[in-house]
């Protein structure tokens, strides 16, 4: 193998300038068509501009490699070259170092070292131009990162040792394209994470958000505070639901019989960081504060309000010792992780103990704070000042906007998109990751056919349909500050590497394309490429979702329901929860059935002690022949079928005749299901009174449509 230094190379400044090379490629390649029937149609993410020529290049024709890269940059790319072309290249004779003609793989970097250092934050610096002809393969880019992405495209173009004649000009849509894996609820060894980094690099992700600590256990060695891993890296049960919801949330030491868990040594972290860097992936650590910290308070109870521990998850933010602890931890984090962003969580802090804590109240009074939300904002700003003083930036979930948003903070918007847009308009960097599209721990197909998951329903098609910055919200300000998007995998119900991969792929591939490719979307074409990618990943040993046999959306969601109570007025005697209002008072008779998940906007949720109690006005006395009501059960979210369903009818709306009182004997142990209540008989009335009682106090009832006399 010959590594040739090229002294003079053309400069490629940006995507528009690079397009001129595509035009040149059209002439050189004598392109006559724009079909993508073979190699090119399977690329994920789809390149911005592809021009396909006639003919193919066999890898055996390549005589060597030429590059103007030196040192570590070429060493990092070298590992991908055999995977990109063919093993046969290694047996070709060396070429003379003085001869330029021939058939080579050329890797040409046209930028500066300074540009290479900031490439992760620039779409232009991640771009590349790839051309394949009878003269060989030429990849040009401003940075090694761009060359790396060109090689990933080249790898996807190969078929049986051949490459199509083609010209590609490409750069990402967003600079931030991330995946988050929760390693607290369940611990995943370094080798498992490396395997996912391989797939992420192949599909051009460039951020790995590492959720290292949470209520499930502390997973990172901190030398100054060894009790974090000695006492809370292991817990007494593997099953999350039993341990968290039904157990005593007890941690234990590694040597305890039945101990479950693990942690990463600092040397293991350095190893993973080097592995990620070689694939141009920045690793962003997350250290949760001030909430989600019950594992810390188990090991160091003095950091809790009142020094109490069990049942508390918030740090005492009024103690100097809390800030000193967090600064010490963050110093070790910054010594390990070179990322500009340090994620501090900031989500779902309960703040209850702060209301009565002497130290917290003193902190509020001293700083003129009126609410505990403002106290959290004050806490976040102090942590941000510390990070900024060390050249880092704070990132947090969108709850950090409550009270007061720290002046330099970046926001990760997970509760929809409004918070992210608000932050961007105020000049804060934003990463979009709304749960209804980007939470890959939710069901991806009919739940009764799937392993246990979170209660939402996020299909490949739904994820692919997401747009982080739709045209209606696009302004120069939002374009400047929405940095990209991220898919998240929370692992409460994901305990094995196989299950982790099953939830990631292929939905992560949809996010890869959303973050990279401009222009209109075509799900049918993307799905074909995803099917090809699934087969490839399975061949490489990944346990993917079976996209070939996908059931898809619930028929009631797609087709609607026609019945005699359609659009009839509903009077609510119990209140639905505002968060799960669906379509408001019209929900239960609008003919629109819900999908498989309870959060997509058609299932109405009730936690009222009365359960579900409504009256439907049929507008005239009607012969009632059948009544159908579907109730969802999702035990992981405290959603159960009703204890009983009572039906009464009335001609005038005052005196009701009971026509049914059915006890539902579905147990929570049955898992996810949609319970179909059915009544058939003969009754007459204008008003139909329906009452469904809660399975147990503080549980939820969800229903989507009350169907009377289906047509």
Predicted segments — roles?
Residues 305-306, 310-407, 414-421:
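Active-site neighborhood of glycoside hydrolase catalytic domains
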């Amino acid at each position: 193998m010959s590594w040739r230094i090229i002294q003079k190379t053309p400069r490629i400044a940006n995507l528009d300038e690079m397009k001129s090379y595509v035009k040149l490629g059209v002439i050189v390649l004598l392109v006559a068509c724009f079909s993508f029937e073979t190699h090119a149609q399977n690329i994920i993410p789809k390149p911005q501009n592809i021009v396909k020529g006639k003919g193919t290049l066999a890898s055996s024709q390549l005589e060597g490699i030429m590059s103007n890269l030196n040192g570590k940059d070429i060493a990092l790319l070298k590992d991908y070259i055999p995977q990109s072309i063919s093993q046969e290249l290694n047996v070709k004779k060396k070429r003379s170092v003085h001869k330029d003609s021939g058939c080579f793989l050329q890797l040409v970097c046209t930028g500066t070292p300074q540009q290479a250092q900031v490439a992760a934050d620039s779409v232009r610096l991640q771009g590349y131009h790839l051309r394949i002809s009878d003269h060989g393969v030429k990849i040009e880019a401003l940075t090694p990162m761009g060359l790396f992405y060109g090689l990933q495209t080249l790898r996807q173009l190969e078929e049986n040792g051949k490459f199509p004649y083609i010209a590609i000009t490409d750069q990402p849509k967003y600079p931030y394209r991330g995946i988050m894996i929760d390693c607290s609820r369940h611990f995943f060894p370094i080798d498992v994470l490396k395997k996912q980094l391989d797939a992420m690099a192949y599909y051009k992700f460039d951020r790995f958000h590492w959720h290292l600590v949470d209520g499930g256990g502390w997973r990172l060695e901190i030398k100054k505070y060894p009790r974090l891993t000695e006492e809370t890296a292991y817990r007494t049960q593997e099953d999350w639901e039993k341990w968290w919801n039904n157990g005593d949330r007890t941690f234990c030491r590694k040597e305890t019989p039945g101990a479950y868990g693990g942690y990463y040594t600092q040397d293991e972290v350095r190893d993973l960081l080097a592995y990620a860097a070689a694939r141009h992936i920045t690793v962003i650590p997350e250290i949760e504060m001030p909430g989600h910290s019950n594992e810390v308070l188990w090991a160091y109870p003095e950091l809790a309000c009142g020094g109490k521990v069990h049942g508390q998850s918030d740090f005492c933010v009024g103690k100097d010792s809390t800030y000193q602890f967090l600064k010490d931890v963050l110093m070790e984090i910054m010594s390990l992780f070179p990322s500009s962003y340090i994620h501090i969580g900031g989500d779902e802090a309960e703040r209850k103990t702060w209301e009565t804590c002497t130290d917290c109240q003193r902190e509020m009074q001293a700083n003129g704070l009126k609410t505990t939300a403002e106290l959290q904002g004050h806490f976040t700003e102090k942590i941000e000042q510390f990070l900024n003083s060390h050249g880092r930036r704070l990132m947090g979930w969108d709850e950090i906007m409550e009270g007061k948003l720290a002046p330099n903070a970046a926001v990760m918007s997970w509760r929809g998109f409004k918070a992210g847009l608000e932050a961007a308009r105020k000049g804060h960097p934003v990463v979009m990751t709304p749960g209804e599209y980007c939470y890959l721990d939710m069901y991806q197909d009919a739940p009764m056919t799937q392993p246990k998951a979170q209660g939402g329903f996020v299909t490949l098609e739904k994820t692919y349909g997401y747009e982080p910055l739709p045209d209606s919200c696009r302004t120069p300000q939002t374009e400047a500050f929405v940095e990209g998007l991220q898919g998240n995998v929370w692992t409460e119900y994901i305990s094995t590497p196989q299950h982790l991969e099953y939830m990631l792929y292929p939905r992560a591939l949809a996010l890869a394309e959303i973050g990279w490719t401009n222009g209109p979307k075509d799900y049918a074409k993307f799905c074909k490429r995803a099917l090809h990618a699934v087969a490839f990943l399975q061949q490489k040993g990944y346990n993917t979702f079976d996209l070939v046999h996908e059931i898809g959306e619930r028929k009631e969601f797609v087709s609607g329901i026609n019945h005699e109570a359609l659009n009839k007025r509903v009077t609510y005697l119990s209140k639905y929860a505002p968060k799960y209002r669906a379509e408001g008072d019209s929900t239960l008779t609008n003919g629109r059935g819900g999908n498989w998940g309870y959060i997509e906007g058609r299932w109405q949720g009730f936690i009222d002690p009365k359960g579900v109690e409504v009256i439907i006005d049929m507008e005239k006395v009607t012969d009632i022949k059948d009544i159908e009501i579907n109730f969802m059960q999702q035990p992981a979210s405290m959603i159960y079928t009703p204890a009983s369903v009572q039906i009464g009818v009335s001609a005038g709306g005052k005196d009701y005749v009971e026509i049914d009182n059915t006890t539902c004997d579905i147990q929570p142990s049955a898992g996810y299901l949609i319970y179909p209540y059915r009544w058939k008989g003969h009754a007459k009335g204008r008003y139909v009174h329906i009452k469904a009682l809660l399975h147990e106090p503080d549980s939820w009832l969800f229903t989507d449509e009350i169907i009377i006399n289906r047509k």
